[in-house]
A protein has these predicted regions:
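Generic protein-terminus/edge-of-domain signal
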Residues: 1-59, 65, 72, 99, ...
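Structural signal for conserved beta-strand scaffold positions within catalytic alpha/beta enzyme cores
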Residues: 21-22, 88-90, 107
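Residue-level detector of flexible, active-site-proximal loop/helix-junction positions
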Residues: 27, 48, 80, 93, ...
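Short, solvent-exposed loop/turn segments at secondary-structure boundaries
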Residues: 55, 79-80, 102-103
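Glycine-rich, phosphate-binding/catalytic loops in enzymes
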Residues: 60-61, 83-85, 105-106
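Ligand-binding loop in jelly-roll beta-barrel domains
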Residues: 71-99
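Amphipathic alpha-helical segments enriched in hydrophobic/aromatic residues interleaved with Lys/Arg
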Residues: 99-137
Length: 137
């Protein structure tokens, strides 16, 4: 029998995960902001928040995700009546395909939301650091 190799194309190759958190913010939470030399995405699992990317504020609600490129200043604040639950993942990636995500936010499909949930489940089984404490790196 002859075996045929199928070469895999790596459009986006994440080199390292820096942080991965899932937590519930207080209703009146405000984070004044930061910037760093790696990518970060913020996914709203529940609630409504305002997100700053450099000088632009955007409102995100349940199911929305935003990407912050390296060295982009970003901040968040809770703006809804309920405490928001957020997933924050930061990572290093030099893939040119990541340019697609610069200054972009999206509403995820149910299948994509399920994938985010799977990432959290896998992370809880893989990493020893608590995911619900934002200051833990």
């Amino acid at each position: 029998m002859t075996y045929i190799k199928t070469k895999l194309k790596r459009s986006i190759d994440i080199d390292a995960i820096i942080t991965l958190h899932y937590f519930e913010y207080m209703k009146n939470f405000e984070f004044k902001g930061e910037s760093h030399n790696f990518w970060e995405f913020l996914y709203v699992d529940k609630g409504t928040i305002a997100v700053r990317a450099d000088d632009t504020w955007t409102t995100l609600k349940t199911g929305d995700i935003i990407f912050h490129q390296p060295n982009e200043f970003h901040a968040i604040k809770s703006i809804g009546k309920d405490s928001p639950n957020l997933v924050v993942m930061s990572f290093t990636c030099d893939s040119p395909a990541m340019d697609f995500f610069i200054r972009r936010n999206f509403t995820l499909s149910m299948e994509e939301r399920s994938m985010i949930s799977q990432i959290i489940i896998e992370a809880r089984q893989t990493f020893s650091t608590p995911m619900h404490i934002p200051s833990v790196e």
